[in-house]
Amino acid sequence: MRVNITLACTECGDRNYISKKNKRNNPERIELKKYCPRLKRVTLHRETK
């Protein structure tokens, strides 16, 4: 079962990306390094509800 998730920057809090994940394979929250346009650099983004 794939669900939509939102990825938020851990430093500024902006929700910059929307993605999908498989809850069966990844039950925990996802953390990815992505580009933050506000800070103009790559930061850690965490899954939010």
Curated annotation (Swiss-Prot):
Gene Ontology process terms (BP): translation
Key words, A-Z: Ribonucleoprotein, Ribosomal protein
InterPro entries: Ribosomal_bL33, Ribosomal_bL33_CS, Ribosomal_bL33_sf, Ribosomal_zn-bd
Signal sequence region: none
The keyword Metal-binding is annotated on this UniProt entry: no
HAMAP family: Ribosomal_bL33
Family statement: Belongs to the bacterial ribosomal protein bL33 family.
Protein name (record): Large ribosomal subunit protein bL33B
Phylogenetic placement of the source organism: Bacteria, Bacillati, Bacillota, Bacilli, Bacillales
Encoding gene (name): rpmG2
